[in-house]
């Protein structure tokens, strides 16, 4: 019998942690991403940065903007590597229509929060979100501190 390969539990490539702090995230959508060969090699080695990345809509298509994929040192010399290029996201028509409607009518932003492996494909987790005001951010910090203090008090009581 063949033994099965052990699957790694962590398929995450990159995270955008600042998005949760700066935006109220609501609807999650999983999107495929169109990549070039050198980009896949760089992603496998973990040279990806998603901070300050967002999604723009142009002519009925979605593009990931602001993400950085650094080329490897041994990349081919005949291929021009653009670390900051726009990358097309692969979405269904229904998902695109939902995104277009939310952005145009309701003033939402589309943010990339994570990049991960799903089988052999690179997927991007995108969210519809509204920007937080400064007082919303302070309230979130206050709530988080209170929850931590409450846990600490309950732990010492028992």
From Swiss-Prot:
One of its GO terms (cellular component) is cytosol. One of its GO terms (biological process) is trans-translation. CDD domains: SmpB (cd09294). InterPro entries: SmpB (IPR023620), SsrA-bd_prot (IPR000037), SsrA-bd_prot_CS (IPR020081). It holds the Pfam family SmpB. PROSITE patterns: SSRP. GO terms for molecular function: RNA binding. Keywords: Cytoplasm, RNA-binding. The keyword Cytoplasm applies. It is found in: Cytoplasm. The keyword Protease does not apply. It comes from the Bacteria. Belongs to the SmpB family. Required for rescue of stalled ribosomes mediated by trans-translation. Binds to transfer-messenger RNA (tmRNA), required for stable association of tmRNA with ribosomes. tmRNA and SmpB together mimic tRNA shape, replacing the anticodon stem-loop with SmpB. tmRNA is encoded by the ssrA gene; the 2 termini fold to resemble tRNA(Ala) and it encodes a 'tag peptide', a short internal open reading frame. During trans-translation Ala-aminoacylated tmRNA acts like a tRNA, entering the A-site of stalled ribosomes, displacing the stalled mRNA. This is SsrA-binding protein. It comes from Pseudoalteromonas atlantica (strain T6c / ATCC BAA-1087). The lineage of its organism: Bacteria, Pseudomonadati, Pseudomonadota, Gammaproteobacteria, Alteromonadales.
């Amino acid at each position: 019998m063949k033994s099965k390969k052990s699957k790694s539990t962590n398929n995450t490539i990159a995270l955008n942690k600042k998005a949760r702090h700066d935006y109220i995230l609501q609807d999650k959508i999983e999107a495929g991403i169109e990549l070039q060969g050198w980009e896949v090699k760089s992603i496998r080695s973990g040279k990806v940065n998603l901070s300050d990345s967002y999604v723009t809509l142009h002519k009925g298509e979605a593009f990931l903007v602001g993400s950085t994929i650094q080329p490897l040192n041994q990349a081919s010399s005949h291929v021009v590597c653009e670390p900051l290029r726009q990358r097309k996201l692969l979405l269904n028509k229904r998902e695109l229509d939902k995104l277009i409607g939310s952005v145009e009518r309701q003033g939402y932003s589309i943010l990339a929060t994570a990049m991960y492996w799903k089988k052999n494909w690179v997927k991007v987790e995108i969210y519809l979100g509204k920007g937080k005001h400064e007082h919303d951010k302070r309230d979130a910090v206050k709530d988080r501190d209170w929850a931590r203090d409450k846990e600490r008090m309950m732990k010492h009581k028992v």
